[in-house]
């Protein structure tokens, strides 16, 4: 078995793209299952993981596919989400502009970030042409310099965008008309390197504390480089959360981000209740000896991207033998 795992690593060198769509639904697992099935209806597209959060009312699906089919799989996901999710009745802690809120393409192997930019632009064109959902490009796929950062694109969310898109030229989409889709809103499409979504839960119900700490640790307010952060409430658990995106784990690791949040919480006499990884992460980003690791509430080996790719290749080899 060890030899099989070592040999299977060659699969990671084949052209492969990761796609990580985020959906504005976290309270109906059956909806996310239907979207996942739509993705896997494209031959060669494999769903590696899903994360469903009822407080955020948001879900993340991670799938991989060859570059020639990844856009088809992404379009099937967006199409199914458009059929199943009505943003007009959506409530949740996480900001959003669309039923499929974000659609990032990430190079895994045999493709470059520039290839993923082209895939993102192709997906955006098709989303407008086939679904009439206005499209904004961000990160490496951005067409405007002030739209590189997702928070600039998202603003205050769907309700604000619904009003502003019709009258404010600065809020016009990169592709599409000056009106959001009635039920699906808009969508932000990107190409980016690996991003790690890492949340730290605080033993407090004061949302102001989480927001203060988020401001303290995020880059845009003078905190850690390559860290985006929000303070959110977890009403079902009676906790608050510092929700972070680490856009370059080589510059700010999970451990460094955790220590910064823990120190900021300690200064406010607040204990850490736990932590979680959302979606998948590269093996190189994980430090099993770090202080955060025992506090991970949801860790399992299948959160490691390479583990899933290796297992998928072993299954493929077994079926072919």
Label for each model-derived stretch:
Residues 14-320:
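Long, contiguous binding/interaction regions
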Residues 1-15, 319-321:
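Short, basic, low-complexity termini and linkers enriched in Ser/Thr/Gly/Pro
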